UniProtKB/Swiss-Prot annotation:
It holds the Pfam family TPX2. The gene is TPX2. This is Targeting protein for Xklp2. The modification N6-acetyllysine is found at residues 127, 332. One of its GO terms (molecular function) is importin-alpha family protein binding. Residues 92-119 are annotated as: Disordered. It comes from Bos taurus (Bovine). Spindle assembly factor required for normal assembly of mitotic spindles. Required for normal assembly of microtubules during apoptosis. Required for chromatin and/or kinetochore dependent microtubule nucleation. Mediates AURKA localization to spindle microtubules. Activates AURKA by promoting its autophosphorylation at 'Thr-288' and protects this residue against dephosphorylation. TPX2 is inactivated upon binding to importin-alpha.
Amino acid sequence: MSQVTTSYSYDAPTDFINFSSLTDEEDMQHIDSWFDEKANLENKFTGKDGTGGLYQGKTPLRKANLHRDVTPLRPVDNTYNKQAEKENLVEESIPSNECPSMKVKETTSRNNPVQPQRRSLRLSAKKNLEQKEKQHVKMKAKRCGTPVIINEFPPSKKMKVQKILKSTEEQELEKRMKMQQEVVEMRKRNEEFKKFALAGAGQPVKKSVSQVTKAVDFHFRTDERVKQHPKNQEEYKEVNFTSELRKHPPSPARVTKGCTIVMPFNLSQGKKRTFDETASTYVPLAQQVEAFHKRTPTRYHLRNRKDDIMPLPSKSVVRICRDPQTPVLQTKHRTRPVTCKSAADLEAEELEKQQQYKFKAQELDPRILEGGPILPKKPPVKPPTQPVGFDLEIEKRIQERESKKKLEEEHYEFHSRPCPTKILEDVVGVPEKKELPITVPKSPAFALKNRIRMPTKEDKEEEEPVMIRAQPVPYFGMPFKPQIPVGRTVEVCPFSFDSRDKERQLQKEKKIKELQKGEVPKFKAHPLPHFDTINLPEKKVKNTTQVEPFCLETDRRGALKAQTWKHQLDEELKQQKEAACFKARPNTVISQEPFVPKREKKSVIEGLSGSLVQEPFQLATEKRAKERQELEKRMAEVEALKAQQLEEARQQEEEQQKEELARLRKELVHKANPIRRYQGVEVKSSDQPLTVPVSPKFSTRFHC
């Protein structure tokens, strides 16, 4: 697969230089002549006199003596050819314990030379490219060869983990190194198994000595940061502020990394007391103070000035015997006030309450001294219950009906009255017939608008004059006396229940006295107590407080948070493992059409190297002006459309008014109807016979 055959053919121009045919000694100096000629042709332009001359303001693109300063262009090669070249360059980086299959692949790639690509490069650029790639591959092989130290503890959440993404080449090299190491380990295991199988069960087998664990130094991420210790910093110097405004501080020097000193982890511990500490043995305060002073270093203790002043050797210090005195302890002032009352205080309070209580004796009932059986008072005999009938409404209605019937049953006698004479003289009870006025014929009012004739004075009925009646003359025999309203003044009384409360209290006292007189208490003597045995109530001993551990909410939240944090770390590690796993994508480069450069069509002025061609531009004002014109045009069209619609509506309304006026005029013209002709009325005699009168047949059997 090192050599790829393509089915594409190109019709490219043949005016190019074949760099493979050139010799290194002859044409090394003139190797870039073709590029200089092209640059000189581009830099020529026609002057004022018509002659062509070099462009004075610009330097030529390339010079013959500047080969190494030009950055080499990378060829567009196939991935397989590129991989073959890199495998040739990695010879030195591959260790000697690689598998033979890898060597076979390398020999096949060496035997098949890479075909020269279509695009050409200068030899100087090609050499520089090869040297740089060799150095790059060596550095990568060294990095991959060094053992990778994986931190056992994942980084904390607050630390920012800088992920350095590796290229596909580095990932491939790492994968290859891992595979080589696995093959070497498998080979060693196979050899050991082979020796064990050949030796058999009877022969002693030499145990393979396991390699000693090599100590690996700790590699802290913080060592990569450049830090300056505060002790090593220079002393503060007074500097002029204005002169140092534009000066930037010098970059810190790269500190050489030394060996990391292995130190034990100093993990933070909470200062909260646990249950075991609180339940420890009791330690007196004096011992605690003494232990605290012993723990404190001597350099933190305050020294007494008297100790510094040494006594003179001439004077002898006389020791005086001192009497022991009790120390003035301050602990009694630190006692808390006792809120619970003692038993003596409680007994004193009960005694005071007993002394304050006054016994009120009741009056002596004289019947107790008189003697005889004391019987309870006989209750008063209540009168028998008198039955009271119900006063129902239905009974009232029945009584009213009976009374009405009695009134109706009264005997009625008929007394005739004289007949009025008016009945004989004239018609009585029939109203007089009103005489209607004779109808006066009048011509119809067709010419008027509403066809209604205005009423004339003759048509108006004569209104009857209103009769004015005089008021009766008042009687002046008695003088007029106006009625004076009686003054009713409401007296305001205070709202109080004093009188009613006093009456109730008197009634209550009276009732209590009656009850006391009625119920005489019976004397019952208590037996004499036995003083031999004293029965006291059992003393209630309270149970001691049971010590229980605190169930704090913070502990529960801490456990929950630790669980979630662990779950997040597991998820992050899983994602990192998935990201580190390499998955190759399918090779689509083989089936794709290769890149074909297209020649750009440029003018002579644009073809000049380094020339600045003014690109077309559009001002924002012009754009806004065009938009404004379009907006005004649209607004004018809308206004014209509105005016046209209004004009059409006005014309339509005028036509409707004209049609309505013509219709009204046509309706107002009178057209006389012809006289109607009716059929004559023929009087015919009736065919029915005359009514024969028949006397009624009255029956008297239903009469009472």
